[in-house]
């Protein structure tokens, strides 16, 4: 007898075992065992755009703590594939490499395509160290790469996401990256990027956090009670990460004097503050 197993996926964790059954074939050879040639999933014409950068986070939020902003640092490279005829995005390939862990706390990392619904994704594949997961119970695609940055320093993750031909503006990198510290519900995001559904919202406006949740302003603090929008997470160009990592335990605006001017201007001035003039 021949046995043919069939599995179905009912949501978005892509394990294809939500409903399974098998066929028992009484007449061997009645089913063609040759795999048919699959058509290409790529559109006839493709353009792609690659962005790179470094993500840096302070793990003591909602307190500023030492505010050295180097507790979790990752380098990323994201490539967006678009149909040249329609302009729609059909695939993104993200590479993340943890560079540095300057904190004493246990921090994990994930990211969310927060402008996109689950129906905008056809599949997600992650290649890298074990322990990654896809949070299928979120309203937007959310990928957790690791729970403890210390164990994966220098190891690369490659995430390939096949999309259902979506507006590229909905999947602009670096999306909504975040760390979570100690527990999954203590998330730290970049300025004005929203928490996921798993975050503990009661932490806002405690200690040094001055978020205005009703206005959609998240994860900020103040400098001397005056300069607002002091971040707990940053997206930087590719720089010598050693400059930031070496400032362990020292406030970032003491290591980089032009940092405050950059924050105060809303990012329009002192754009090269990280060059430490």
Spans of features found by a protein language model:
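Extracellular distal adhesion/interaction modules in secreted or cell-surface proteins
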Residues: 1-277
